[in-house]
Amino acid sequence: MKVTFEELKGAFYRVLRSRNIAEDTADECAEMFARTTESGVYSHGVNRFPRFIQQLDNGDIIPDAKPQRVTSLGAIEQWDAKRAIGNLTAKKMMDRAIELASDHGIGLVALRNANHWMRGGSYGWQAAEKGYIGICWTNSIAVMPPWGAKECRIGTNPLIVAIPSTPITMVDMSMSMFSYGMLEVNRLAGRELPVDGGFDDNGQLTKEPGVIEKNRRILPMGYWKGSGLSIVLDMIATLLSNGSSVAEVTQENSDEYGVSQIFIAIEVDKLIDGATRDAKLQRIMDFITTAERADDNVAIRLPGHEFTKLLDDNRRHGITIDDSVWAKIQAL
């Protein structure tokens, strides 16, 4: 089925207000969920909303909490999220990193006691739209086996890097081959994964999303490389925020909350003039996209460039929502 942006935001707002969320908070949160979905990231927008409400109802999320700055060291700040709403807090933290970068050239905000930020790419994009390089990542509950293990002991720990090119170039990737949200998207669509995404119950690589969702043996991105990167991202976020590691979140909490996150903004224009910046970025993009194609029918893509088209299509033709997901939201 298809819905308009206003219908989608209205559905989110209704559910949030039914939980006695303050009007301005409910409006901003509903806006962010709707914008994420409109951008084509269904896995962390509309599909994730029922899970968000579950955590809200369980008390994992404290909707009226106010994040508090704990430490200030010039270009670096440490904040405590107080388990406030994840996407609203993350937006505020990247805004703060941008403010610090405008003063120092670079700004870094380390956040503890945070909740799931939904679409991490929103915050990298937020920085790039203002002309900054945006880098951010989060740890999580243990949902992935380290390389060589069967048990989940590391997080998917998504990493975002956004560049202020035209259009914006952005990598938004979990440390697994696919996020659990994308496993759900493919399962709901009745599709196999395009490449192996995890192991089946016999320890063989599989493209079946439902099998991986059930046994939790998701495949690290780049095998041992993604496993290693997940571990060091967790260590950095934990140390800089003085917050919880994947081990602590997993062993001490009843669900995924109280995570640690990093937000970095870099003001490129303090280091290079605008014309030179644009020319260098365009040369990089042209050099890549003019390579001889392996398949004439498949274009060479740059990361993140598809979001501009997805957003335009959804604004023109309406936002496609899975019927079962829409039914869940209507029942909340």
Curated annotation (Swiss-Prot):
Signal sequence region: none
Keywords recorded for this protein, A-Z: Cytoplasm, NAD, Oxidoreductase
Catalytic activity, reaction form: 3-dehydro-L-gulonate + NAD(+) = 2,3-dioxo-L-gulonate + NADH + H(+); 3-dehydro-L-gulonate + NADP(+) = 2,3-dioxo-L-gulonate + NADPH + H(+)
EC nos: 1.1.1.130
Amino-acid positions noted as binding NAD(+) in the UniProt annotation, renumbered to this chain: I168, T169, M170, V171, D172, M173, S174, W224, K225, G304, H305, E306
Subcellular location(s) of the protein: Cytoplasm
NCBIfam families (alphabetical): PRK13260.1
Name of the gene: dlgD
Taxonomic path: Bacteria, Pseudomonadati, Pseudomonadota, Gammaproteobacteria, Enterobacterales
Protein name: 2,3-diketo-L-gulonate reductase
Listed GO CC annotations: cytoplasm
Assembly and binders: Homodimer.
